[in-house]
Amino acid sequence: NNKNELVEKLDFFKIDLVIIGPEIPLANGLADLLRKKDFKVFGPNKDGAKLEFSKSWAKEFMQKANIPTANFWKVNSIEEAKKIINLSSIPLVVKADGLASGKGVFIPNSIDECFKAAESIFNGKFGNSGNIVVLEEKIQGPEVSIFALCDGERYTLLPTAQDHKRLNEKDTGPNTGGMGAYSPAPLLTEEYLDKIIKEIVEPTINELNKRNIDYRGVIYFGLMIT
């Protein structure tokens, strides 16, 4: 938490490469600070980390880059959320905008459950991560994970994976940070993976470059196959 103390320790131990894994230090700009101090860092700068720590920013990024994504609404109050929920003709997923250790996504089965999920977020369940709520069209299908190792301009794909987030057996219960995963994801054929690269991975890299976002690290793509 003490950035100055961390820099002193890195200098003292003559660290050649700093690998930043957790999202919170990246969201707080640790990679930016260390690069200014001339350390070699594996991990995106704060702007790049927004893809992970702000769902609304990531959704708007995808829209701008013409990346397929579910319809969504960014809301700033419970009143605004309730209005959209009441008017919606499609099932919705309720998400805290910020980091919530993988627990900030609610999959309600009724309008009342939508209200309760939005209320719990706005009432501080996830602190400042819940200052904004994202209401998203609910889509069905298996989830897969794609990982791209990026140097700021180019990328190479790592092996695919399929994780299971629901707490209980038979894919039921609330979402967690992950109950288990296996790799590679068997449902991703070479043809399907080529489609994902063309429609999702490459447009993401191109949009980052257009915005002059120096993304050096692993980009995680959490996808739902419909």
Description of each model-found segment:
Residues 1-47:
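ATP-binding N-terminal substructure of ATP-dependent carboxylate-amine bond-forming enzymes
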Residues 7-9, 50-56, 168-170:
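Short, charged, surface-exposed secondary-structure boundary motifs
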Residues 9, 13, 83-84, 117:
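CheY-like receiver
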Residues 19, 42, 93, 134-136:
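Structural detector of well-ordered beta-strand residues that form the stable sheet scaffold
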Residues 26-28, 81, 143-144:
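Short, well-ordered alpha-helical microsegments
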Residues 42-104:
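A conserved helix-loop-beta module that forms one wall/lid of the active-site cleft
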Residues 108-226:
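Internal nucleotide-binding/catalytic subdomain
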